[in-house]
A protein has these predicted regions:
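Non-ligating segments of multi-cofactor redox enzymes
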Residues: 1-260, 266-298
Length: 298
């Protein structure tokens, strides 16, 4: 396929063509209070009570809203824990509307990993590491739900275990900017910061070598959205009348999805790379319900 043909195909799919710009815009909107990065102050206005769709630390000085995973842990770990209709409804609503499109287009930490993976150098496939996919579901159940709910202090409150002990985004967006702007915070940094910074450094290195290791193996938010991939309104649709079975789509998929057989696999982040690779234009986005037989979403 010539470069002209590729450009013509991508122009028909603006979401795919402008994905990088959409990710940048989403990150900016999620962290709109840029001056706070230099002041070392966390925005705490009324909007902060609302969750953003992607993984974005509440403690980031620039953060527009709350991280949904952090907010969920705060409710689960509360001494007055009640079923959180708002946050659970938030997950269900976005999951049904978009699925893991949020991971592919709207998540700041996902974009950060994408940028790291663009650094020139040898890259490695994760195709043989597929069992590690299930680790993120274990982390969701254990660190986001069970530990905050059952490991509590004398007041009956649990820590946000995932945020406190695992999440590298908290160090990248929260601890580092706050420490750079506040000498008091710098002097208070201890072993926990060192441990979390080591996790961040590890995922920076892994993201250069592998595509989105945090999204694939660790992220509990991605685990939640993945549960809705097969039922979300936004889907990847394969026209089997056009498909020639070349498997180019599956070979370019960095999330290790067999696009032809399972286009809406839980790991699919709707990035659109399969659409760009398809020589017959057999793959497209579809929004809503479809009874067409050619849309094989099994």
């Amino acid at each position: 396929m010539s470069e002209l043909d590729k450009k013509m195909k991508s122009s028909k799919k603006p979401l795919v063509r402008f994905r990088g710009w959409i990710q940048a815009a989403a990150t900016l909107l999620t962290n709109i209070h840029i001056p706070n990065l230099f002041k070392g102050k966390i925005y705490q206005g009324n909007v902060k009570t609302m969750c953003v769709p992607g993984l974005n630390c509440y403690s980031c000085p620039a953060a527009t809203g709350a991280c949904p995973i952090g907010a969920f842990q705060a409710v689960v770990g509360s001494s007055k824990f009640k079923f959180t209709y708002y946050i659970t409804g938030f997950f269900i609503l976005l999951g049904v509307l978009l699925g893991r499109f949020i991971c592919g287009f709207l998540c700041p930490f996902g974009w950060f990993q994408d940028l790291l993976h663009k650094i020139p150098g040898k890259k490695f496939s994760t195709a043989k590491l597929k069992p590690l996919r299930y680790l993120k579901y274990v982390i969701l159940v254990v660190f986001v739900i069970l530990l905050p709910a059952f490991v509590t202090n004398s007041l009956g409150m649990g820590d946000p275990f995932f945020c406190k002990y695992i999440c590298p985004q908290g160090v990248l967006e929260g601890a580092i900017p706050l420490a750079l702007a506040n000498s008091g915070i710098r002097s208070a940094l201890g072993h926990l910061f060192t441990f979390k910074f080591t996790i961040l450094a590890l995922f920076i290195i892994l993201s250069i070598l592998f595509y989105r290791p945090f999204c694939k193996w660790i992220c509990p938010l991605g685990a939640i959205y993945s549960l809705f991939n097969k039922v979300s309104f936004l889907k990847i649709q394969v026209d089997h009348e056009k498909c020639v079975g070349c498997q180019k789509c599956s070979r370019v998929c960095k999330m290790d999805v067999n696009v032809v057989d399972t286009p809406n696999h839980p790991e699919c982040i709707r990035c659109g790379e399969c659409m760009k690779a398809c020589p017959t234009d057999a793959i497209c986005y579809h929004y809503g319900f479809s009874n067409k037989k050619k849309a094989d979403n099994k």
